[in-house]
């Protein structure tokens, strides 16, 4: 569960390393974001050769959370970090590679490109 001012690692090669959540999208009173939700973020740390720079405001989809997510069969999946993938307006990732595992719930929310680029889907 992520909210405003939460810091996330970036799990792609778009150039950003760390981002800060400035808004959870999906409703006027929506407070928390979980896996598969879209958030507006600002880049706090970036590599000098990347396509996004420090201070850029972009959209991202949450791919891993420490809080985890509960599945229909009763199992819970949790990750070691909070991570997001920066996306373009057409909901495709801005980078060309995804680092680390992602949750299966992204497939249900139609982020097929992220699922196909990920090295492992849990």
Swiss-Prot record:
Protein name as catalogued: Large ribosomal subunit protein uL14
Membrane spanning residue stretches: none
Subunit record text: Part of the 50S ribosomal subunit. Forms a cluster with proteins L3 and L19. In the 70S ribosome, L14 and L19 interact and together make contacts with the 16S rRNA in bridges B5 and B8.
Chain coiled-coil ranges: none
UniProt superkingdom: Bacteria
Ribonucleoprotein in keyword set: yes
Pfam families noted in UniProt: Ribosomal_L14
Described function: Binds to 23S rRNA. Forms part of two intersubunit bridges in the 70S ribosome.
InterPro entries: Ribosomal_uL14, Ribosomal_uL14_bac-type, Ribosomal_uL14_CS, Ribosomal_uL14_sf
NCBIfam families, per the entry: rplN_bact
One GO term (biological process): translation
Organism this protein belongs to: Acholeplasma laidlawii (strain PG-8A)
Keywords: Ribonucleoprotein, Ribosomal protein, RNA-binding, rRNA-binding
């Amino acid at each position: 569960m992520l909210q405003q001012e939460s810091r996330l690692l970036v799990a792609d090669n778009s150039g950003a390393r760390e981002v800060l959540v400035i808004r959870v999208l999906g409703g006027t009173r929506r407070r928390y974001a979980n896996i598969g939700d879209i958030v507006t973020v600002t880049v706090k740390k970036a590599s000098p050769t990347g396509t996004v720079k420090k201070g850029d405001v972009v959209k991202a989809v949450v791919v891993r959370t420490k809080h985890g997510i509960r599945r229909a069969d009763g199992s819970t999946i949790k990750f070691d970090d909070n991570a997001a993938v920066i996306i373009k307006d057409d909901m495709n990732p801005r980078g060309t590679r995804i680092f680390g595992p992602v949750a299966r719930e992204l497939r249900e929310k139609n982020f097929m490109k992220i699922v196909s680029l990920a090295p492992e889907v849990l």
